[in-house]
Amino acid sequence: EIQQIVRFLGNHGIKEIELIVASSIGADLAMAFLTEIKIPVKHVFFDGGQFAQIGKATRRIMVPFLYIAMKSLYWSKGKTLKRIMWCDDDKIKPYFIEAGKNLTYGNLRRQLTDSLEDKPFSELSEELQKHTFWEFGSIEEHFKYRNAVMQTYIYGNFPVFEGFNHMQYQIQNPEGFSRM
């Protein structure tokens, strides 16, 4: 996946990235990009949820249930979103419906095999940490991982969206999020 991104950037003459925004499981791909590729990145924003650390057996057990949950979003045209997430906001339904449509069991299994691992976090340079934000919603389940992330990335920025759940601020206030 990383090499596909590198080829795409190269084919389009992109030599520097202004901002990477990564959330949930996709943040593992962003972290791999940041640690393996030498293309300069000016700013990074991570939603805190991807820093959950879940054991291998639990992740393996999660795959069929998560697969059915994600596929149900497509099959139901988004009606099951409120059962899976904290919201059923019409702004995000199309993205989840499309994700459910395109999801394959094998891809999800591979993604969870190397995501959310219970292992040390990847190293980032002091300079990149200063321009990186790890956001957590104060009421999201993954808030409990915030201290471990703060101890690893001591030069980073750690805003807390008070009273918000996982990705809730970004979805409900995209203008405020982009100003931040």
Positions of predicted regions on the chain:
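Active-site loop/oxyanion-hole signature of alpha/beta-hydrolase fold enzymes
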Residues: 1-19
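Gly/Ala-rich beta-loop-alpha elbow adjacent to hydrolase catalytic centers
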Residues: 21-30
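Short, hydrophobic alpha-helix immediately C-terminal to the catalytic nucleophile
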Residues: 30-35, 178
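Flexible "cap/lid" loop of the alpha/beta hydrolase fold
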Residues: 35-71
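Conserved alpha/beta-hydrolase catalytic His-Asp/Glu region
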Residues: 56-58, 73-126
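Conserved serine/cysteine hydrolase catalytic core
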Residues: 113-150
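Catalytic histidine neighborhood in serine/cysteine hydrolases
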Residues: 152-167
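Catalytic histidine-centered segment of alpha/beta-hydrolase-like enzymes
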Residues: 164-176
